[in-house]
Regions:
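Alpha-helical support elements that line or immediately flank enzyme active sites
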Residues: 1, 85-107, 210-234
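Short, charge-patterned binding micro-sites
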Residues: 2-18, 247-251
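Beta-strand segments within the central parallel beta-sheet cores of soluble alpha/beta enzyme folds
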Residues: 2-3, 50-54, 166-170, 236-245, ...
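A structural-propensity feature for long, helix-poor, extended segments
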Residues: 9, 114-129, 233-256
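Short glycine/threonine-rich loop-to-helix capping motif typified by GTGT followed
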Residues: 19-21, 174-188, 244-256
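Glycine-rich anion/phosphate-binding loop at the beta-strand->alpha-helix junction
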Residues: 144-230
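Glycine-rich, mobile lid/loop segments that gate access to catalytic sites or pores
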Residues: 6-7, 17, 28, 32-178
């Protein structure tokens, strides 16, 4: 997040005692991640003047004892996970979600190649009316030619939307200050975007920052794999798989 003193990054969580992750390791990982995702420093988030805190702690002994087993590893927490697939797209993902992801991928390429663009952006696609509505917000330099940018983004959208569309580019107007300087970031805040979009229910757990013992991640991936194979083998047009677990138990409580 941005601060008055140049920015702050807090790395927290619980890890296995055998991981042997040092503070130097954390600093290296953080700096590498930031350099991949941020081009421009701001007064309140300066890549060369950050305060980086390592607050990783050992995992609870109660959780470790419940999860670790020589034969069957137990689930790292309780939870409900959802996997989904549809034959409406080649990726087996919901159509508007698939379109938005493809637009975002092309936009990412443009951002990395154009010195007038920074790397903060998001895409929203909705359909159901006469036109497909596409909202794109992308961070830029103050001196950018917005007419040129609109043309470039319109071309990206037209390559991914087959029907007639309406593009709303940077509806807030100027978007110069972005990334952690513009918004406080936190892992797990966008679980619907990380999954399938709003047309498919989510179990509630985030994917990021978790090892495979955390079924929020591993069981969600397994449920998606099962749903995708059911649709790919033409056993259904759409498939939603739901699975639930209790902490410490190797077998799911429910699979539907």
């Amino acid at each position: 997040t941005g601060t008055k003193n140049g920015g702050l990054v807090l790395v927290g969580g619980e890890i296995s005692e055998i991981a042997e992750i040092t503070t130097d390791d954390v600093l290296t990982i953080v700096k590498e991640a930031l350099n991949k995702t941020i081009k421009t420093s701001f007064e309140d988030f300066d890549l060369d003047n950050l305060s980086i805190y390592n607050e990783l702690t050992p995992q609870s002994e109660e959780i470790r004892a419940a999860v670790e087993d020589d034969e069957d590893q137990g689930a790292g927490d309780q939870g409900i996970m959802v996997g989904f697939a549809t034959n409406k797209t080649k990726s087996f993902m919901p159509p508007t979600f698939d379109i938005s992801r493809n637009i975002q991928k092309s936009l990412w390429d443009l951002q990395n190649s154009d010195e007038m663009l920074d790397l903060d952006s998001k895409v929203q696609v909705t359909s159901g009316g006469e036109k497909t509505k596409v909202v794109v917000s992308t961070q830029h330099n103050k001196a950018i030619d917005m007419e040129k940018l609109f043309h470039e983004v319109s071309e990206i959208v037209s390559n991914n939307v087959e029907s007639e569309f309406e593009l709303d580019l940077n509806p807030s107007g100027s978007f110069v200050k972005g990334g952690p300087a513009g918004d406080t970031g936190l892992t797990g805040r966008k679980i619907v975007v990380d999954a399938y979009g709003p047309s498919v229910p989510v179990g509630g757990g985030a994917f990021s920052g978790k090892d495979p013992s955390k079924v929020d991640r591993s069981a969600a991936y397994a449920a998606r794999h099962l749903a995708k194979n059911i649709v790919a083998h033409k056993l259904a047009d759409d498939c939603l798989v739901r699975v639930s677990y209790a902490i410490g138990k190797a077998e799911p409580y429910e699979l539907t």
